[in-house]
C-alpha cells in the first residue's frame, strides 16, 4: 500500500493530492470488491466512509482529479463470474453520505437552490431507515417475477433469481389492477438479529466459520450457487425504490411505497413524509432511539425528495442522485483496553475466546466483555490466512492506517488498545486494534490446545472436503468433559436417542450437580436411595430459594401420601432406565453425540457394522489408512475437485511428465491449469505434488466409510477424531458393559413406500414430525426436508408453505395427513 500524507486536505500540495488520490481510489476500489463482490469486508463502514470523504475532499479542492481514479464514480463491484450477468435497464446507483445535522440543512438548501424554490414553497422529503443488507433488483413482467439481480457495479449485476424465489417475503406474483406490465422493484435483502444468531449457532455447531454480521450473512446466503442453501436461511426483504417501469403507479416516493404495499411487497413501516429540516431530524432521532429494538440492522436514515417530477429535474452527479442522501448514524463504538483473554467451553466443546475489557460505555451501555469469535479472529486472519484487520490511526476517527507496516500484525493481545463495536442486542465485539498504542511487552496470545474444563486435547479438525482446518477449536473430551457433560447427557436420554422416559432437563441437572451421573454409563448404575436423596435435596433447595424470595416460610414436610407418590416416581425413573438395557444400534450411535453424526448417519453406520466393537475397529482401521495432505489438498484446490484429481493421478502414474500439456490423460481446462500453477509454481512443481498425492492415497478401510454417500469424508474424520481419544473409548466401553445393542429390523417391504422419497410439511395434528418420519422410514421410505423432481410424495398439513409450491412446480403428488395415515394402515 502506497504511503499517503495524513495532513488535512487544505494543506497538501497538488503533487501530494495526485498521489493521495491515486492511492485512495485504488484502495476504495479494492474495498468495494471485497464488500460487494466477496461479502468479506476487512474494514468497518465508518473507516470506509472516512476514506470516501477524504477522496471527495481532495476532488473538491483539486477538481481536475475528479473522475480520474478507480473509485470516483464507481458503485459496488464487478459482478462475479460465478453467476450469469444481468444488465440493469436503469442503473443501481449509490447515495451520498452525511453525518452531521448541518449537512442535512445544506442538502435541503442545495436542492432548493438547484430547483429555484422560493422560501415560501415547502419541499416534501421522505425519510426511511437505511437497511444494512444487500441491494436487490426484482423485475416483474405481467405481474410475474422473471429476474432478480444484485447491484454488482451498478450497471451489471448477478442473476440470483433461483435463490430469490426461496425468500418468502418476495412474491412470485404482484397483486392489484394497477401493477405495471414492466415493474422493476429495488430493495434490500437482510437478516433479522434473531435469525442471524440462529444461523451462527448452526455454523458453530457444524464447525464452520461464523458470519461477522447480519449483512455478511445475508449477502453470503443470497449469493450461493446452491439455492437450497439460500432456502435454509430465512432472508427478508424491504422494497423502497423503482427501476424500469412501463407505467408509474404514483407520482411521488411516498405514493410508490403505498403502491408497493398494495402490490403485496413488504415495505418498511418507519417510512414517513417530512416538510422541513426539523421534521427530518426529528424522525432521524426517533429511529436512532428505536434502533436497538427494531430487530434488524440499520445504519442511518435515507432522505429522498418526494416528487418524482422534482427528482427528474435534479438528476445525478457522479455516482449518486442529487435528490437523495443517507444520514448515517454514528458508530456505536468506543476505545478501551483488553485486560485479559479468557476461554469459555461451549456445550458442544467449542473453545470460545472472550476479551475482558476495562469497562467502557458503548451506545449507552457499559461493556466489560467482548467476543473474539475464534482462534483465527484473535490472530487477525480469516480461514484462508488473509488479514481481517488493518490497524487504525486515531487522527481521522478510526480510518484505515496508511503508515503502518502490517507485517507487525493486527492480532489481538492482552494490553492492546482496541475498538469495540456494539449493534443492538448483539454481543459486543473487538473490531480493530490501535497498533500505535500496543505496549512494548505485549506478546501474541497463545490459544490453548488443552481444554480448560477437563484437560483433554483441544483440536481444530481438518476438513478433508475443503482441505482446511475448521475455524473452531474443540475439546475432544466429549463424554467426560464437565463443560459439555449436561448437554451430552440431555442428548443421550432424548427422544431420538435412547429415549429414556422421565429424564428431562431438570432430572439430568439434579443428578449431574449431585455427582451421581457424569457420563452415560452412570445412568445404568443408579440405585433407589442415592437417587431419592438427590431429588429430595434438590426439591428442598428450590423450596428454600422460593421462600427466601417471597418472604414466606418453606413448605411443610411431605405427607405419607406425597412421599409414596415421590417413591413411585423414582421407581418409574429406574424402570425407564432398565427398559433401555437393549437398544437399536443406530440409536446407540446417535446417542453418543459424535460431531457430524446425526440420525441419518447413525442409521448408515448401523448398516455398515453389526455392533459397536465392529464399528470401533472399522474406525481404527480407517484412521490407519487416512489420505495424506497432498492427496486431500489437490482436490481442495479451486476448480480442481476429486474427479480431476483422479485424472491427474492417472496421468502421473502413466508416466506423463508435463501434466499441463494438451492431450494428456488429465484433460485440464485453462482455469484448472491456472489454479494448479498458482498452488505449485511450475509444471514440475505440479507433477511433484501429484506424485506425492499418488503415494498418499487412502486405503480401502478409509474409503469404505469416506466414499459412502451417506457417511462421507467429513463424518469419517469426525469418527476418527472421537475414537482416537482414549477417554471416549473408555466411556463407550463402560456403557457397553451396561447396555446391549441390536441391529434394527430391516424396513418392511411395502411396495407403496419402498425406495420412495417423502416430504412432510405444515402442521401435523395426529402425530409428531418425529413419529411421521419414523413410520415412513420403517416402511422403507426416505424422508427429505425439501421438495425436488426426485420427490415422490408430499404430506401437507395446515400452514404448508413454499414446499407446496415446489410440489406443484415439480408435479409431485400432494396428500393430507389423513390420507397418509390411511396409506400407512393399508401397508
Curated annotation (Swiss-Prot):
CDD domains for this protein: BRCT_DNA_ligase_like (cd17748), LIGANc (cd00114)
Pfam assignment, any one: HHH_2
First-tier enzyme category under EC: ligase
GO biological process, one term: DNA repair
Residues annotated as catalytic: 130
Residues noted as binding NAD(+) in the record, renumbered to the chain: 45-49, 94-95, 128, 151, 188, 304, 328
Keyword annotations from UniProtKB, A to Z: DNA damage, DNA repair, DNA replication, Ligase, Magnesium, Manganese, Metal-binding, NAD, Zinc
Similarity-based family: Belongs to the NAD-dependent DNA ligase family. LigA subfamily.
Protein name: DNA ligase
Gene: ligA
Amino acid at each position: 500500500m502506497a504511503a499517503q500524507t495524513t495532513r488535512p486536505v487544505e494543506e497538501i500540495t497538488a503533487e501530494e493530492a495526485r498521489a493521495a488520490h491515486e492511492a485512495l481510489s485504488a484502495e476504495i476500489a479494492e474495498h468495494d470488491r471485497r464488500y460487494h463482490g466477496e461479502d468479506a469486508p476487512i474494514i468497518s463502514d465508518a473507516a470506509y466512509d472516512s476514506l470516501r470523504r477524504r477522496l471527495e475532499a481532495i476532488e473538491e479542492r483539486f477538481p481536475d482529479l475528479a473522475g480520474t481514479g478507480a473509485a470516483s464514480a464507481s458503485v459496488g463491484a464487478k459482478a462475479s463470474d460465478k453467476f450469469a450477468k444481468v444488465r440493469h435497464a436503469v442503473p443501481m446507483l449509490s447515495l451520498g453520505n452525511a453525518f452531521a445535522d448541518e449537512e442535512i440543512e445544506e442538502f435541503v438548501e442545495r436542492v432548493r437552490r438547484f430547483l429555484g424554490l422560493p422560501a415560501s414553497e415547502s419541499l416534501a422529503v421522505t425519510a426511511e431507515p437505511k437497511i444494512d443488507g444487500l441491494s436487490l433488483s426484482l423485475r416483474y413482467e405481467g405481474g410475474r417475477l422473471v429476474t432478480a439481480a444484485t447491484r454488482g457495479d451498478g450497471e451489471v449485476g448477478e442473476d440470483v433469481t433461483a435463490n430469490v424465489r426461496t425468500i418468502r417475503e418476495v412474491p412470485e406474483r404482484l397483486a392489484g389492477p394497477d401493477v405495471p406490465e414492466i415493474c422493476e422493484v429495488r430493495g434490500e435483502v437482510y437478516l433479522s438479529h434473531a435469525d442471524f444468531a440462529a444461523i451462527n449457532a448452526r455454523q458453530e455447531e457444524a464447525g464452520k466459520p461464523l458470519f461477522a454480521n447480519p449483512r455478511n450473512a445475508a449477502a453470503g446466503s443470497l449469493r450461493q450457487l446452491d439455492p437450497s442453501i439460500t432456502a435454509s436461511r430465512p432472508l427478508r426483504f424491504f422494497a423502497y425504490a423503482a427501476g424500469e417501469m412501463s407505467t408509474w403507479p404514483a407520482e411521488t416516493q411516498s405514493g410508490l411505497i403505498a403502491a408497493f404495499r398494495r402490490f403485496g411487497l413488504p415495505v418498511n413501516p418507519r417510512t414517513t413524509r417530512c416538510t422541513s429540516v426539523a421534521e427530518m431530524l426529528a424522525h432521524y432521532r426517533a429511529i436512532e432511539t428505536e434502533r436497538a429494538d427494531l430487530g434488524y440492522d440499520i445504519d442511518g436514515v435515507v432522505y429522498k425528495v418526494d416528487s418524482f417530477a422534482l427528482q427528474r429535474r435534479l438528476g445525478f452527479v457522479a455516482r449518486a442522485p442529487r435528490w437523495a442522501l443517507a444520514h448515517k448514524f454514528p458508530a456505536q463504538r468506543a476505545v478501551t483496553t483488553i485486560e485479559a483473554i479468557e476461554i469459555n467451553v461451549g456445550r458442544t466443546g467449542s473453545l470460545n475466546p472472550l476479551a475482558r475489557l476495562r469497562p467502557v460505555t458503548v451506545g449507552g451501555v457499559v461493556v466489560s466483555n467482548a467476543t473474539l469469535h475464534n482462534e483465527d479472529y484473535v490472530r487477525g486472519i480469516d480461514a484462508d490466512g488473509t488479514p481481517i484487520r488493518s490497524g487504525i490511526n486515531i487522527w481521522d476517527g478510526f480510518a484505515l492506517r496508511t503508515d503502518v507496516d502490517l507485517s507487525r500484525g493486527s492480532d489481538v493481545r492482552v494490553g492492546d488498545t482496541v475498538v469495540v463495536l456494539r449493534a443492538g442486542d448483539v454481543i459486543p465485539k473487538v473490531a480493530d486494534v490501535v497498533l500505535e498504542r500496543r505496549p512494548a511487552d505485549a506478546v501474541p496470545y497463545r490459544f490453548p490446545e488443552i481444554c480448560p474444563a477437563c484437560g483433554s486435547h483441544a483440536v481444530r479438525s481438518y476438513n478433508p472436503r475443503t482441505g482446511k482446518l475448521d475455524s473452531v477449536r474443540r475439546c475432544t473430551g466429549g463424554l467426560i468433559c464437565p463443560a459439555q457433560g449436561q448437554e451430552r447427557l440431555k442428548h443421550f436420554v432424548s427422544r431420538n436417542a435412547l429415549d429414556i422416559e422421565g429424564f428431562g432437563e431438570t432430572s439430568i441437572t439434579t443428578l449431574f450437580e449431585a455427582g451421581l451421573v457424569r457420563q452415560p454409563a452412570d445412568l445404568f448404575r443408579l440405585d433407589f436411595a442415592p437417587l431419592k436423596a438427590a431429588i429430595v435435596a434438590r426439591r428442598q433447595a428450590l423450596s428454600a430459594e422460593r421462600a427466601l424470595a417471597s418472604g414466606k416460610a418453606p413448605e411443610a414436610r411431605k405427607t405419607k401420601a406425597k412421599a409414596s407418590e415421590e417413591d413411585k416416581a423414582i421407581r418409574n425413573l429406574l424402570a425407564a432406565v432398565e427398559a433401555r438395557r437393549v437398544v437399536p444400534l443406530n440409536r446407540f450411535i446417535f446417542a453418543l453425540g459424535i460431531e457430524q453424526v446425526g440420525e441419518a448417519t447413525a442409521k448408515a453406520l448401523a448398516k455398515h457394522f453389526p455392533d459397536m466393537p465392529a464399528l470401533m475397529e472399522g474406525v481404527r482401521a480407517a484412521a490407519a489408512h487416512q489420505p495424506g495432505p497432498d492427496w486431500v489438498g489437490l482436490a481442495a484446490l479451486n476448480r480442481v475437485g476429486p474427479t480431476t484429481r483422479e485424472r491427474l493421478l492417472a496421468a502421473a502414474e502413466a508416466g506423463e511428465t508435463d501434466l499441463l500439456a494438451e492431450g494428456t490423460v488429465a484433460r485440464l481446462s485453462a482455469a484448472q491449469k491456472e489454479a494448479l500453477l498458482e498452488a505449485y509454481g511450475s509444471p514440475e512443481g505440479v507433477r511433484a505434488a501429484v506424485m506425492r498425492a499418488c503415494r498418499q492415497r487412502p486405503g480401502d478401510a478409509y474409503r469404505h466409510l469416506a466414499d459412502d454417500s451417506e457417511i462421507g469424508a467429513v463424518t469419517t474424520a469426525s469418527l476418527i477424531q472421537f475414537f482416537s481419544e482414549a477417554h471416549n473409548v473408555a466411556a463407550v466401553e463402560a456403557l457397553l458393559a451396561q447396555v446391549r445393542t441390536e441391529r434394527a429390523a430391516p424396513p418392511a417391504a411395502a411396495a407403496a413406500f419402498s425406495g420412495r422419497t417423502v416430504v412432510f410439511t405444515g402442521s401435523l395434528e395426529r402425530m409428531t414430525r418425529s413419529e411421521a418420519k419414523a413410520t415412513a422410514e420403517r416402511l422403507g421410505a426416505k424422508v427429505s426436508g425439501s421438495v425436488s423432481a426426485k420427490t415422490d410424495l408430499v404430506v401437507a398439513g395446515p400452514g404448508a408453505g413454499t414446499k407446496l409450491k415446489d410440489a406443484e412446480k415439480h408435479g409431485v403428488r400432494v396428500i393430507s395427513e389423513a390420507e397418509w395415515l390411511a396409506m400407512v394402515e393399508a401397508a
